[in-house]
From Swiss-Prot:
One GO process term, biological-process aspect: L-arginine biosynthetic process
Protein's name according to its UniProt entry: Arginine repressor
GN (gene name): argR
Cytoplasm is among the record's keywords: yes
One GO cellular component, as annotated: cytoplasm
A Pfam family recorded for this sequence: Arg_repressor_C
Species annotation: Moorella thermoacetica (strain ATCC 39073 / JCM 9320)
Keyword annotations of the record: Amino-acid biosynthesis, Arginine biosynthesis, Cytoplasm, DNA-binding, Repressor, Transcription, Transcription regulation
Pathway: Amino-acid biosynthesis; L-arginine biosynthesis [regulation]
Length: 151
């Protein structure tokens, strides 16, 4: 739901000049989504939306160049707290179990952090495989995951 809502937000701001959180919330409600101002505010922050000039003394929301997350660590903390159910490891692999449908979002956020020890992730519906190199770095990565979970 969250991913779909955020994708809709990106489509809306690309096609409609939206200047305020209230206006964005109204547009989402018009499309059948139940949202609060707090939800819209979090989505704006997680998506890293910026305000750009839209005429004289007017501004509108826009996606940042390249649409990279501005605060991927903060988003990952929230995703870990909300989604991760179990973490296990073997050799240079870490397996993260999540609630159904959330693994891709968690893996995408992990990838955006560009940790040098993580050479890649593979996500299914509720499972993420994290590949660590060298295998001696697994303990370091697991500690980071624990810290994320403690938020």
């Amino acid at each position: 739901m969250k991913t779909q809502r955020q994708q809709l937000i990106l489509k809306l701001i690309a096609s409609t000049p939206i200047a305020t959180q209230d206006q964005l919330a109204r547009e989402l409600r018009r499309r059948g989504l139940r949202v609060t101002q707090a939800t819209v505010s979090r989505d704006i922050k997680e998506l890293g939306l910026i305000k750009v000039p839209a005429g004289e003394n007017l501004y509108r929301y826009a996606a940042p160049p390249g649409q990279r997350l501005i605060n991927p660590y903060g988003r990952l903390q929230r995703l870990f707290a909300d989604s991760v159910t179990k973490i296990d490891d073997s050799e240079n692999l870490i397996l993260i179990r999540t609630l159904p449908g959330t693994a891709h979002a968690v893996a995408s956020c992990l990838d955006s952090l560009d940790w040098p020890e993580v050479i890649g992730t593979v996500a299914g519906d509720d499972t993420i495989l994290v590949i660590v190199k060298p295998k001696e770095a697994v303990a370091t990565v697991l500690q980071r995951f624990r810290e994320l979970g403690e938020g």
